[in-house]
Amino acid sequence: MVKGHVLVCVTGQRTCERLISAGAEYTGGAPGRLSVVHVARTGQRFLGSEDEAGALEYLFQVSRDYGADMTLMHSDDVCGAIVTAAKKCNCGVIVLGAPRGNTRGLQLPGLLRAQLPDVDVHEIITSGE
């Protein structure tokens, strides 16, 4: 079990269920310590397609099943939005998806670690992201 709150960052894909499940494990089953966030860039619709709409609806249900709240946000600064959400909930752990294979182009985990040095950032290998 970890100290503080656990924040899970999801995309509009059903495979993010694995991230929510992993986040729930970090809480050790403690109620009220899990939040899920999806950040869409400003100008993009949250429900950009039927697939994404269905996936986000599914992830809302999965979040509820784990006793988590789920927030949808718009921001041109995805990292900044996640940092704000993490500070707001006194986050101790952030859970992110990481694609299988080459991750050299991904900057978000490093940016989060730099801006939130006291928060553990965990990357979970997912398929389809």
Predicted regions and their residues:
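A short acidic, amphipathic alpha-helical/loop segment
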Residues: S21-G23, I82-A85, L108-L111
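Structural motif
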Residues: C9-Q13, S75, G97-R100
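Charged helix-capping and loop-helix junction motifs
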Residues: D51-L56, L106-P109
